[in-house]
């Protein structure tokens, strides 16, 4: 018997597996005895709808907590709906630090760059590596803080390698502004509990839909 939904965390994110628990299976049993295909369809739709609900819930919660654009959080979410005869769906949330330019429109100021209420003093907005403008600061700047530039990578004239980013040579190391999403890590268990509760609500709705469809079909016979 299924143990219900659960989450598995790793260094760079968390995978939420959404699947029926004993409570959900109990709700399915009566219909499954009479209309097994209808019960399976109801379960599949309920899980997939709950995955969509959970994705929106997480995006809004993290966006509000970290003061970043919901669209930026959504880019870190990957949904894997129920397929075929499967009984579970999955939702991946990557929590590696996100580039500051992605959380909202960056704006140059007299003291540096600001984005969504975050101020990066001494920083500048420009293309250092790649085609996108990012927020950068020289490592030697008095305004540099490792907290504002987590998980930075280094690219030199010879190509990328781990470490700091070099603008034109290794003599001028630059750090890219990023926003840590590590604060989301403790919330995965809470999200799983919410998803389990929502799954039961949606499952009952889908079961009722299948029952009504069956009754209407019989009434026309």
Residues of each region from the PLM?
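Short, Lys/Arg-rich flexible segments
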Residues: 2-221
């Amino acid at each position: 018997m299924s143990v219900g939904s659960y989450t598995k965390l790793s260094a760079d994110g968390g995978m939420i597996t959404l699947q029926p628990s004993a409570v959900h299976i109990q709700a399915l049993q009566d219909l499954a005895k009479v209309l097994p295909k209808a019960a399976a369809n109801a379960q599949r739709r309920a899980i997939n709808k709950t995955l969509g609900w959970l994705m929106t819930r997480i995006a809004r919660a993290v966006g509000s907590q970290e003061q970043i654009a919901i669209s930026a959080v959504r880019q870190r979410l990957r949904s894997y709906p129920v397929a075929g005869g499967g009984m579970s769906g999955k939702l991946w949330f990557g929590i590696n630090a996100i580039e500051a330019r992605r959380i909202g429109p960056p704006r140059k100021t007299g003291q540096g760059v600001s984005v969504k209420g975050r101020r990066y003093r001494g920083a500048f907005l420009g293309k250092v590596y790649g085609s996108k403008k990012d927020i950068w600061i020289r490592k030697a700047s008095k305004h540099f803080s490792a907290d504002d530039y987590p998980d930075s990578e280094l690219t030199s004239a010879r190509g990328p390698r781990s470490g700091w980013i070099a603008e034109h040579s290794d003599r001028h190391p630059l750090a890219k502004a990023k926003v840590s999403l590590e604060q989301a890590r403790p919330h995965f268990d809470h999200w799983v509990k919410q998803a389990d509760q929502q799954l039961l609500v949606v499952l009952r709705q889908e079961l009722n839909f299948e029952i009504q469809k069956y009754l209407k079909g019989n009434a026309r016979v």
